[in-house]
Amino acid sequence: VIDAARAHGFKSVSVDLIYGLPKQNVISFNRTLEQILALSPDRLSIYNYAHLPSLFKPQRRIMDAQLPSGETKLQILQLAIRRLTEAGYVYIGMDHFAKPSDELTTAQRQGRLHRNFQGYSTYAECDLLAFGVSAIGKVGPTYAQNVKTLDEYYDILDSGRLPVLRGIELTPDDLLRRAIIQALMCHFELSIESIEIAHLIDFRKYFAAELADLREMEKGGLLTIDDQWISVLPAGRMLVRAIAMVFDRSLPSDRERTRYSKVI
């Protein structure tokens, strides 16, 4: 498939890998990496397996004892980062790697990198149209998800309506937090002054609770905070999702206890 894509002029070929699968370990994942590196894709994404048996019935056949521990998953992620960087890939952040010549790497270097719910992208603030069962779309400050069963999807389309199950319109606070999360995930730094000017807030007053959480991460060597910038350190890049989650208002109140276990 990769050879065919290149033969037909595809500019970039991406491969997704999942870690945390049943019976997976560091040795087996290393074998997978060796096979993938031999194919030399332009981009790789390393995703954490989401075990949600309450939502996905086939996952109920998987026993919890078959799943690798959090420690093993962290070792797998560290292995992936080391092997891919040694092979010449640039660590874009979180879960993405790309060759130095790839446009994703160029966008990161030029400060044009963007992230949506599908991953990193070179296209900032584009509307996304959702086609298919359970697909999620974004238009302006709104998000919408389609219905989750094929029969219902076709029935609604046949009746001349859009098969939307639910949606949300972002509030000014949502837009503010989205801008902060985007900056941290894409550029690994946040200009406090820029946020204050763009959203007309006093950052330290508005995010007093969040800054207290970040101070704990600062003590752990994940980031630094000064008068004008929040900067993610190299050790924090692997956990930038957890850093960004501090600003996610939709998380439960006990987020501090569960943040790292959810990320790894």
Question: Language-model features: where?
Answer:
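Residues at alpha-helix caps and immediate loop-helix transition turns in enzyme cores, especially N-
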Residues: 28-29, 206-209, 243
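C-terminal scaffold of the Radical SAM
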Residues: 1-204, 258, 262-264
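Minor-groove-contacting beta-hairpin "wing" of winged helix-turn-helix DNA-binding domains
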Residues: 229-233
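A short, conserved structural fragment
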Residues: 218-228
